[in-house]
């Protein structure tokens, strides 16, 4: 009998404890599965960038070797990704690119250079973006990670974006870096402006294509078939990105604001760059004094001086402020500043 009781007790201890439907544990589990609130760069005024950690808490992404590339084709031409260090920084966090109906430019920008070309040949440089896999993703904010969320949506027809300065001679390619800064990404399936059409929450890989032709036989860019051309295709794994309609990872938002020269208006309410923000407190106080109180006082005195010139009788009202007579005191200046202001009445 005692053995049976002991056995029954063990069975009860081994049974999983059922949590009430509305328990705190259940509520916390549901919160864990919620999707992140989208944050676009236009809304960063509500984001405290100083509170965002500089490193992502998620697991390592297996950073690719800088300069590593995959090459396909029948030409001996070599291609190098310029700015690969910046791309690697974004890759470590999980690069995101905004797509809109009207089209949005990429940052970082795809920039490449070429070697082993024929100097007098013609070269056409293309960029396209292809899906990495057949999955759709979602971003889990409290885990700082992208997770699969089902099968991919139908893939839009692939487009090649021809660099607007094509064709290049081999000599020109050796002397210049080819930048696709004007390339735009869109989610408009009926786009007719030549933008690259992508699906949001899908992962993509940019590719560079170079097609060689002789000057006597130029290429029609609207009828190009890569497999029928003398060409090479280059893929740099660190340029992979997630297409989004609003930035999901706040670390990506922070890095884009820091590195994108067109986002300087979002960096600091005072307009200071990161280098200026690292200056000593004394320098910052001096700079703030010059740009605020000194400048405002000088402007006020200039307006007052002009008013007194037009109506000298008003001076009677300011005897307590200016006891020296008709002369206004000079505005304070900052020694050594090339833009010193010192305004006196004439």
Curated annotation (Swiss-Prot):
Any Pfam family: T-box
GO annotations of cellular component type: chromatin; nucleus
Transcription recorded as keyword: yes
Region (Disordered), start-end ranges: 33-66
Biased composition (Acidic residues): 33-48
Alphabetical list of PANTHER family matching this protein: T-BOX PROTEIN-RELATED, T-BOX TRANSCRIPTION FACTOR TBX20
Name assigned to this protein: T-box protein 12
Lineage: Eukaryota, Metazoa, Ecdysozoa, Nematoda, Chromadorea
């Amino acid at each position: 009998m005692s053995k049976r009781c002991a056995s029954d007790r063990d069975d009860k201890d081994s049974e999983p404890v059922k949590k009430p439907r509305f328990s705190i544990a259940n509520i916390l589990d549901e919160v864990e599965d919620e999707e992140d609130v989208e944050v676009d760069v236009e809304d960063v005024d509500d984001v405290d960038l100083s509170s965002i950690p500089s490193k992502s808490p998620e697991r390592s992404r297996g950073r690719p070797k800088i300069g590593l590339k995959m090459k396909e084709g029948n030409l001996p031409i070599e291609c190098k990704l310029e700015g690969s260090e910046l791309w690697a920084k974004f890759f470590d966090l999980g690069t995101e690119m905004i797509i809109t109906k009207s089209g949005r430019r990429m940052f970082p920008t795809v920039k490449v250079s070429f070697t082993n070309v024929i100097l007098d040949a013609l070269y056409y440089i293309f960029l396209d973006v292809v899906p990495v896999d057949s999955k759709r993703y979602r971003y889990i904010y409290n885990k700082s990670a992208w997770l699969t969320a089902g099968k991919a949506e139908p893939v839009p027809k692939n487009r090649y974006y021809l660099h607007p300065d094509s064709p290049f001679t081999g000599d020109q390619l050796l002397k210049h870096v080819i930048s696709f800064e004007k390339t735009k990404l869109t989610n408009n399936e009926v786009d007719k402006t030549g933008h690259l059409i992508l699906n949001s929450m899908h992962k993509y890989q940019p590719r560079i294509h170079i097609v060689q032709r002789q000057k006597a036989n130029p290429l029609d860019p609207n009828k190009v078939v890569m497999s029928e051309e003398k060409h090479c295709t280059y893929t740099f794994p660190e340029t992979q990105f997630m297409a989004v309609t609003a930035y999901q990872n706040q670390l990506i938002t922070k890095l884009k604001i820091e590195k994108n020269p067109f986002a300087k208006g979002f960096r600091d309410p005072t307009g200071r760059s990161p280098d200026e923000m690292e200056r000593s407190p004394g320098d910052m106080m001096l700079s703030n004094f010059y740009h605020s109180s000194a400048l405002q006082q000088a402007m006020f005195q200039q307006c007052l001086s002009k008013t007194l010139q037009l109506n000298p009788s008003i001076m009677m009202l300011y005897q307590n402020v200016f006891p020296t007579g008709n002369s206004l005191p000079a505005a304070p200046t900052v020694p050594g500043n090339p833009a010193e202001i010192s305004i006196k009445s004439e």
